[in-house]
Amino acid sequence: MAHAILVGEARKRSLSIDIYSAGIRDFSDQPPLIETSSTCLHYNTPPPKVRPTWVGELPLRSIDRFLVMEQVHADALESEFGIPADRISLLGEFDPKHRGIEIDDPFFSYSEQTYRKSYELIRDCIIGYLDTADELR
């Protein structure tokens, strides 16, 4: 969802930035999650691409900022993929309502309400990031 939200918000601001989305575990052979797609559609956000992407498939050296939901994701980017800590940010750090720096993955909830709350939190954090990110100026 974060990728879909960031693409939409960047487009609203006419930002010309490359946006990638990937997991630290390889689920590239799995279909997109129905819950993610239906939540995005509920908020009139085009849903994510056809299949999940694994971080190892990305052009890692060319990416300036990695936004992650949980510290475990940041740790994996550093230890498994050699990404310097100064290029990684917890998305929750940009939450204007300060609800916490980590955002729980709604996957295991299987709950429409949880997915919608996650969407709204992620959207708020992405807007906060876009409003404050020095690398976008």
Protein language model features and the residues they cover:
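Short polar/charged helix/loop
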Residues: 1-137
